[in-house]
Structure formats: C-alpha cells, structure tokens
C-alpha cells in the first residue's frame, strides 16, 4: 500500500461538504433580534454524520445553570452545538458532581467520540450543565 493513500483519503474526507452532518454551524445559533443561543443539545446521533443532531432539541441561553436537568433530558443528549465565544460545561452526575468536561465553540455531532474517563464517553451521560458566553 502506498504511503500516499491514507493522506489522499484524509484530504478527500476533509473536502466533503457535509462532513459536519446535519448539525447547524455554531455561528447559526442566533435569533432574529440579534441575541444568540449559548448552545443546543440534541437527543439523536448516528454513525453517519449527516443523520446527527436530530430528534428533540434543548436550547440554552447564556447563563443557563442547570444542576438538575429536566427528567426527559438527564442522560439523553448525544449531539450538541456551542455558539461562538461561548462555553458549555457538563457534569456526569446531578448536582454538578462526577466527571466534568468543557465544550468550547463548535459542533459536536457524536458525543461518543469524546471520552469520559477510561471506559466511558459523553453520549447519554450529561446530567448537569452550565453555559456562558463572553
């Protein structure tokens, strides 16, 4: 196998227009009146990126502080998008306990790709959160 083949494959995948999937761009988290949403959580993800960020949606305004997520959202989020100049801090247990992770501005279509400790990941593992924008 040519050493050039993996490089060409990586370049081809990077140039695919839908590589980020059906998730909105982080810059698109704005309201018509000029205010912005800090982050959006989605309860559906998929091995195919174009099918991510589907299902139910939870929008968070800047300053959202939820040590206890609503019962239908606890351990449910599997995709998320964070607006520019915003940061979403999540915890694995209610009351802001357990493992923690900070997501900066960007699109995260598959939370399975983000490690939570040695054996876990962040898909269906968010029990508390805090979202802030500067």
From Swiss-Prot:
Cellular component aspect of the GO annotation: zymogen granule membrane
Domain of life: Eukaryota
Function noted in UniProt: Functions in exocytosis in pancreatic acinar cells regulating the fusion of zymogen granules with each other. May have a pore-forming activity on membranes and regulate exocytosis in other exocrine tissues.
Membrane topology qualifier: Peripheral membrane protein
Keyword Signal: yes
Cellular compartments annotated: Zymogen granule membrane; Zymogen granule lumen
Gene: SYCN
PANTHER family: SYNCOLLIN (PTHR17503:SF0)
Keyword terms, alphabetized: Cytoplasmic vesicle, Disulfide bond, Exocytosis, Membrane, Signal
UniProt keyword Signal, yes or no: yes
GO BP, sorted A to Z: exocytosis
Disulfide links within the chain: none
Transmembrane portions of the chain: none
Name under which the protein is recorded: Syncollin
Assembly with partners or alone: Monomer and homooligomer; most probably hexameric. Interacts with GP2.
Species: Homo sapiens
Mod. after translation: Contains intrachain disulfide bonds.
Signal peptide: 1-21
